[in-house]
């Protein structure tokens, strides 16, 4: 990314990481990344409706508006060797919520502490996801031209739904399909502006 950024100093990272507009979460294909709060509706719109077990339901109700640390979130549950299975279940439930972008983290600088403190913020029910077709159009305009195979890394919906939505967006004129030879003909999806430049 550095070749795309001007006047960036590595010491600026701390300011970026602790900015209240920056979220850390499993954004793409279960990989952890950082994004701006304004991009959350698009990223959430690319995902299917989240699935909740009873433990996930319980945990999400405990997250206040201002967020909560993991220690505080788990504080009401028994600890120790005898309860290791409970702690494993809690970590698994929280990880499941992160994977589905139900929650994301923000980092807070705490005085006299070497590392930043991670605060879990609830996104589900607080941030309204874009409809899938709009989220897909926005994604393509940001990263296109892009192949179907690459789009699958960003979308956690069935590939059939993705292919149907791409066909519908192309039919509506929201996106363009460009065929490139590499060496076989390959479909790329892009905005009309990008398609004209190619």
Sequence positions of predicted segments:
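Long, low-complexity intrinsically disordered regions
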Residues: 1-198
């Amino acid at each position: 990314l550095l070749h795309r950024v001007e006047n960036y100093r590595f010491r600026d990272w701390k300011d970026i990481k602790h900015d209240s507009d920056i979220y850390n979460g499993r954004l793409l294909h279960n990989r952890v990344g950082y994004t701006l709060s304004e991009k959350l509706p698009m990223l959430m719109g690319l995902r299917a409706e989240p699935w909740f077990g009873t433990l996930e339901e319980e945990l999400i109700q405990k997250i206040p508006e201002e967020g909560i640390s993991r220690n505080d979130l788990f504080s009401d549950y028994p600890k120790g060797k005898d309860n290791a299975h409970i702690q494993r279940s809690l970590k698994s439930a929280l990880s499941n919520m992160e994977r589905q972008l139900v929650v994301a983290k923000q980092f807070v600088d705490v005085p006299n502490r070497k590392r930043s403190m991670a605060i879990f913020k609830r996104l589900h029910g607080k941030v309204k996801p874009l409809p899938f077709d709009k989220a897909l159009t926005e994604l393509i305009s940001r990263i296109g031209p892009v192949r179907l195979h690459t789009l699958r890394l960003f979308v956690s919906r069935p590939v059939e739904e993705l292919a149907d939505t791409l066909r519908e967006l192309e039919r509506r004129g929201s996106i363009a399909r460009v065929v490139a030879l590499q060496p076989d003909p390959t479909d790329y999806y892009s905005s009309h502006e990008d398609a004209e430049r190619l």
